[in-house]
Amino acid sequence: MFDIDGLVSDSLKLLADRVDKNYRISLVIVGPPGSGKSTIANELCERLNSMFHEYLKEHGGNIEISGVSEPLPVDITEPIREVSRNIVEYMTSNDGILPQSVEDLDFECVKFQDDGRDNGNVNGNVKVIGRGGLPNAIEVSPYHDLSKPKEKCDVNIAQIIPMDGFHLTRKCLDNFKDPVNAHRRRGSPSTFDSNNFLQLCKLLAETSNTKIPLSRFQNSDNDDVDAVWEKLAKTFTSDVQDIYIPGFDHSLKDPTSNQYCINGFTRIMIFEGLYLLYDQENWSKIYQVLSGTDALLIWNIDIDEAVIQDRVAKRHLNSGLVNTFEEGIDKFQVNDLLNARSIRQHTLDVKDVVTIHND
């Protein structure tokens, strides 16, 4: 089993080291199917948020919202090319996708402003899309008012950022040159919108590099946990845009838009996914983007194939993807096992990765 206390301790050490330099730190949990990435990420997220909530409870619940010392651009999506309204309407009429682009690993992510024509919801948000189209869209809000959430439970400093929300939809897979194989191999590297996930990492890395005024703490060498919580509580900013990303439930089979929100309270980003250390196509660039913030910690889960076979077969059964446990094993062996071995074969050779076990 994994040592959650050790992961929490390592996370807090990184936070203490970088809180004066980065608005956000990045924690990455990577491993094969069935390795427990989501379970670990959720438990770590809950522990960190609970610790901060307890600090607020013991210290009157006061938080301060300020500006940043090195402001971000008004719109962090500014460098992204804007797409015409005709293209948006074309996507809308094609299940939200660009059929001719679903396999284009070199697709350049584009953006458009949501004017409410398609859903009646005029919010001024900017949608960023990759080759997966609207179902895998990143939505960036121009509004970042942090003054409303006054309850301590609303101030969550840790947020999970799952790669799974960037599964290409079944409609996308239908438009592959070999749709039968695309569906059979769903979960392999090419069946994710790696273009847009990489774009998400770039946007979040930019927010991580934002610095905040900490002059009142500069004469203090105290880096215990309460001192770190105090710095966070006094240095939230509304100048960081809200970023919404899709989630994924295996039983629903396709992504759910805007399931997660990274807002101004988010100071710890917990990335989890299969291919975050993969050395092929767009995945190979993620490490460089996140490590460029100098506020990164990576855990790679090493686990026996027999263990993940049992777990994934049960997950397939519970999600309704198969009718029996034996069918779940068969599905694992013709797809998930291939992905697991590919991950092991194509993991980036970088030094600052901590191996953990979750058998």
Curated annotation (Swiss-Prot):
It is an enzyme of class 2 (transferase). The gene is YFH7. Keywords: ATP-binding, Kinase, Nucleotide-binding, Transferase. Belongs to the YFH7 family. Its EC number is 2.7.1.-. InterPro entries: P-loop_NTPase (IPR027417). ATP-dependent kinase that could be involved in endoplasmic reticulum membrane assembly. This is ATP-dependent kinase YFH7. ATP binds at residues 31-39. Transmembrane segments: none annotated. The keyword Magnesium does not apply. One of its GO terms (molecular function) is kinase activity. It comes from Vanderwaltozyma polyspora (strain ATCC 22028 / DSM 70294 / BCRC 21397 / CBS 2163 / NBRC 10782 / NRRL Y-8283 / UCD 57-17) (Kluyveromyces polysporus). Signal peptide: none annotated.
